[in-house]
Amino acid sequence: MYAVIKTGGKQYKVVAGEKFKVEQIPADIGSEITLDQVLALGAGETIKFGAPLVEGATVLATVVSHGRHDKVKIFKMRRRKHYQKHQGHRQNYTELQIVSING
């Protein structure tokens, strides 16, 4: 069974037991969180779509770790004007492990 969930403005296809990284969620490491924005559920040949969410469907996940992604380098330049700008950015993330999919 799989589910398509929405968190942090992005959509993820998840399966029970899978680990994946999402935008930072303010939760303690080891705590269980419930993701209730389930857009679709699938099991074999049957797929259940929500409009926009599937009624009564939830995904239970455990917070594994918090961290920061690799640095993204930004470089801006205006030719012939002696203008150069360097900038870097590291996005925070939360790593989750799916415990169960209910619905």
Swiss-Prot record:
- Please name the InterPro entries in this protein's record: bL21-like, bL21-like_sf, Ribosomal_bL21, Ribosomal_bL21_CS
List the NCBIfam families. L21 (TIGR00061)
List the PROSITE patterns.
RIBOSOMAL_L21
Biological process (GO) annotations held by this record are:
translation
Q: Which family does it belong to?
A: Belongs to the bacterial ribosomal protein bL21 family.
Record carries keyword Protein biosynthesis: no
Provide the gene name from the record: rplU
Q: Does the keyword NADP apply?
A: no
Q: Which UniProt keywords apply?
A: Ribonucleoprotein, Ribosomal protein, RNA-binding, rRNA-binding
- This chain's protein is named Large ribosomal subunit protein bL21
Please describe the quaternary structure of this protein: Part of the 50S ribosomal subunit. Contacts protein L20.
Q: Which Pfam families match?
A: Ribosomal_L21p
A GO MF term: rRNA binding
One annotated Gene Ontology cellular component of this protein: ribonucleoprotein complex
Report the protein's function: This protein binds to 23S rRNA in the presence of protein L20.
Source organism, top-level taxon: Bacteria
